[in-house]
Amino acid sequence: MASAGAERRPGVQEATVVGQGQLTEEPGSAQTSECPVAGDQFLVPAHEARGTQSEDQRPAGAASESELQEEGPKLGEERPKPHAGALEERGPRPVVSIVRPRHGPKRKPVKSLSLPGLRAHLKAEAELPPKLPLQEEEPEDSQSEPSPSAKQHKKAKKRKSLGAPVLHAVASMVSAPLETLRLERKAQRLRPLYQYVNYCNPELNQAGKGDGEAEVEAEAELAPVPEEGGVEQLQALLPLAGELGPGLALPCPSPLVTPTHALAPLGEEAGEEPGGLPSLGVSDHKAEVDKSTQVDIDKMLSVCTAPLVPPLSPQYK
């Protein structure tokens, strides 16, 4: 570089000397307007001459550096242009603010759409809003119109209320034959049991329902007999009490008391007489009933004492 600078300086000095010589020659030739310099040559100012000589003497490396410096800002200006074009192609994106529904938790609005994860999330959320109006419409419809299940429930209640009296009537009609069937089944079950228990006394097994009904009728006929006999006895004894005389009469003022007291000795006397008053028949019937009941009791006791299981081998008495 120092040698290049030394070379530049003598050239500059020569130019200055030539220029001064030319300028000094001009006043001498003031008469003529033309310059004595040849046609191909023309005068150049000193500072311009220096610039031209310096440019000519510069090496190729300096020229390349200056060209690179000039091209650098041009490239810097051209580089942002593709980015700006891409932005123009994409267009200005509006700022989207997405808010969650009222019933959900609060969420901050989303302002950036650069990340792919956010885009996918926003797409998933974009599908949700159409479903919300349907869910909101359903409670309105349910409030305006009752559900079909409620209607069916009401209809079932009406059917039950209408069918209840009919069912009660049918049940009352069916209950009577059911009770009779139950009684018959019980009798059928118990009959073989009695036969098995009373195997030692076959007489009890032969006794049927007719015998029991006959005994019940006999007891029903015997029950009113004492009343009728008592009335007839009073009617028969009243004249007898009047014939006895005042000697048997008691000091009691009421006349009805005397016959009642007089009945006792008369009844005793009548009991002694054979075939007297009907009181004898009543006592005979009672004695027969007592005997029959005693016989039945004895039979039942014998059945209870007998073994319930029939013997495997014959037992000799």
Curated annotation (Swiss-Prot):
Bias-annotated ranges (Basic and acidic residues): 1-11, 47-58, 71-92
Bias (Basic residues) ranges: 100-110, 151-161
Polar residues: compositionally biased ranges: 19-34
Pfam families membership: DUF4691 (PF15762)
Region (Disordered): 1-164
Protein name (record): Uncharacterized protein C16orf86
Origin species: Homo sapiens (Human)
